[in-house]
Amino acid sequence: MDDKKTWSTVTLRTFNQLVTSSLIGYSKKMDSMNHKMEGNAGHDHSDMHMGDGDDTCSMNMLFSWSYKNTCVVFEWWHIKTLPGLILSCLAIFGLAYLYEYLKYCVHKRQLSQRVLLPNRSLTKINQADKVSNSILYGLQVGFSFMLMLVFMTYNGWLMLAVVCGAIWGNYSWCTSYSPEIDDSSLACH
C-alpha cells in the first residue's frame, strides 16, 4: 500500500510540475529527471537525453512576431530560420491568393450553369454538375480551414501573409457577385 501511495504522490508532483512549467513558461526543458521516492529506492533518470528544445515546435497562445520553431499546420513545415520564414510567408501568400482564385472559379462556374426553366426563376443543374460543384465546394472549405489553421499559429508574419494574399487575390479576381447565387458556405476565410 505504501508503494502505491508513494507512486501516486510522485506522479501527482510530476504532473503538477509539467502543468506549471508549460502554463507559466518558467522552463523550456527539463534539466534532469531525478525523482527521489520517499521510503523507496530512487530512480535517477538524469542520464536520459531529453533534447535541447531547439527543434521542437512552439505553440503560441498569444500574438507573436517570433518565427523560430514555428510549425505551420504540419510538423514537417517547421520554421527555424529567417529564410524559412520568408519562404513560408510567400507560400502562404500564394495559398491565400489561390483560395481567392478558387472562389472566383466557383462563382464563374455557377453563373455559367444557370439555365432558367420556362416561366420560372429556378435553375436546373444536371447530376454531373452537382458532383463537380460539391467537389469544388469541398476544396473551397478545406482551403479555408487550412488558412484558418495558419492564422491560428498567432504568428504575426504568417497572419500578415494570409491577409495580403487574400487582398491581392480579391483584387485580381474580384467579381461583382450576383445576389441570385447563394454565396453561403463554411468558408472561414
Curated annotation (Swiss-Prot):
Keywords: Copper, Copper transport, Ion transport, Membrane, Transmembrane, Transmembrane helix, Transport, Vacuole
A cellular-component GO term for this protein: fungal-type vacuole membrane
Classification via InterPro entries: Cop_transporter
Signal peptide: none
Segments traversing the membrane: 82-102, 143-163
Keyword presence, Cell cycle: no
Example GO molecular function: copper ion transmembrane transporter activity
Vacuolar compartment residues: 103-142
Record topological domains on the Cytoplasmic side: 1-81, 164-189
The keyword Ion transport appears for this protein: yes
Similarity annotation: Belongs to the copper transporter (Ctr) (TC 1.A.56) family. SLC31A subfamily.
Protein role: Provides bioavailable copper via mobilization of vacuolar copper stores and export to the cytoplasm.
PANTHER family from the UniProt entry: COPPER TRANSPORT PROTEIN, SOLUTE CARRIER FAMILY 31 COPPER TRANSPORTERS
Listed name of the protein: Copper transport protein CTR2
Species in which this protein is naturally found: Saccharomyces cerevisiae (strain ATCC 204508 / S288c)
Encoding gene (name): CTR2
